[in-house]
Structure formats: structure tokens, C-alpha cells
Amino acid sequence: MNMSQSQKIVLQPRSIVVPGELLAEGEFQIPWSPYILKINSKYYSTVVGLFDVKDTQFEVIPLEGSFYYPKINDIVIGLVEDVEIYGWVVDIKAPYKAYLPASNLLGRSINVGEDLRRYLDVGDYVIARIENFDRSIDPVLSVKGKDLGRVSNGIVIDIMPVKVPRVIGKNKSMYETLTSKSGCSIFVANNGRIWATCPSRFSEEILIEAIRKIENESHIKGLTDRIKQFIEEKLGERNASSGETKTNS
């Protein structure tokens, strides 16, 4: 860790921090984060979280919180809340509503009086990219790109946005466990929504239970193995139950 004498990181890596706790002193070149407050040359945590350090960089990974903070090029799953003349107002689980211009979805200018509900209506989900955002304007969405657009099948599962890294796992280990064991195809968006298509209602139920377990136990080591065992046990119970039914019949 190559720091100057004027720089000091107060806490050990992987420490649990609380709001107002001092993290570091001095001048550090770190990206802006809603979870770190700088006052003069001191850095404080704004949330309950995990303090992570890499060389002279540090961050706070929140362990709780329901809001998503948009970043340009993030992929999100939005819920259409309103249809306006020139586009759609979309909830992306952020403190700000997002906007999807109709011209972006249609690839052309809209016609006067055109009913945009034909393409996206209130209650529809849409997979989109954050095209533009800063703290002076609301997020603008784009659906130009592969696999972007209206969600037309499957289910959407909401989780806390701060749990997204845990659902994906290191080197996608948790993601691969969920998909291979449940048989479901899933897409985890940056804003804490998961789109899933499953081969059966039973697989759907197992997937939802497993994801809730990840949310509730995200602080526990060895969680990927626990989830693998959990799904295998659920499948085993179902297979055992099916076997008993066939025997009795």
C-alpha cells in the first residue's frame, strides 16, 4: 500500500462500519460514492457497511438499503409508471424517476396522437441501459442494444440493490449455482431486479426462496455452498414426494 505520510486509513480492510465512523484522513483520489462523506480531509461512512481497501483506494459496500444509485451504462430493469406524450416514466428503484424517450424505443419520431401504450404500458417491465445521468437531471434510458427492451415473459424478482453482488457471487459462482441447480435462466440487473424464466412453477418457487435466503444471509461465509445444498435438498424433497405418490398409486 503506497501512501504518503499525509494519508492514513484508519480501519482494517473488511471492517464493519456504521454511519459517522471515520474511515481515513488525508487526500485520496476515490470515486464519488453516496456511502462516503468527505469533510475537510476526513472521510466518514454514511451507512452500515463493509470497508474495503485496495492499495490507496477504499470504498464502503453497504449491507442495507433499498435505493439504487444510477451509473451511466448500468443495465437496469425498470417498471413503467406513466405514459406521457413523448415517452415513458420508469421506476428504477432510485431516488429519481427515469425517462425512456419513445423515439429511442421506436427508432423513429412519434406520430401526432400516437398511442404509446401499444408499445409499453403502465405495469410493464423493460430492460434498459442508463444512457445519461448526473445529479442535475433525472436518468435517461436507452433500449438500443442486444437483449434490451420489453420483458414479455417470465417473472421479475425484487431484491435490495446492495445485494446484487452477492447474488452474482465471486467469478459468478452464485449466479452459476442458481442457474445450474434450479434450471432457470436469470438476468441480474444493477438496480436490484432479477428477470427469471423457469421450466416449471416449482423451479420458480425454489429460485425465489434461494434468492431470499441470499438476501437474508449475505454476511455469512460459505453462502454459495449453503445455497447449493438448499436447492438440492428442496429438489430431493420434491423427488421423494413424487416417488411416494407413484408407489401409492
Curated annotation (Swiss-Prot):
Positions of the KH domain: 154-211
UniProt keyword terms in alphabetical order:
Cytoplasm, Exosome, RNA-binding
Q: Enumerate the GO terms in the molecular function aspect.
A: poly(A) binding; RNA binding
PROSITE patterns membership: S1
GO annotation (BP), single: CUT catabolic process
Describe its assembly. Answer: Component of the archaeal exosome complex. Forms a trimer of Rrp4 and/or Csl4 subunits. The trimer associates with a hexameric ring-like arrangement composed of 3 Rrp41-Rrp42 heterodimers.
* Notes on the domains: Contains an N-terminal domain that mediates interactions with the hexameric ring, a central S1 domain and a C-terminal KH domain. The KH domain is required for efficient RNA degradation, but is not responsible for poly(A) preference.
Checking PANTHER family in the record gives: EXOSOME COMPLEX COMPONENT RRP4, PNAS-3 RELATED
Homology family: Belongs to the RRP4 family.
Protein purpose: Non-catalytic component of the exosome, which is a complex involved in RNA degradation. Increases the RNA binding and the efficiency of RNA degradation. Confers strong poly(A) specificity to the exosome.
The protein's name:
Exosome complex component Rrp4
Species, as recorded: Saccharolobus solfataricus (strain ATCC 35092 / DSM 1617 / JCM 11322 / P2)
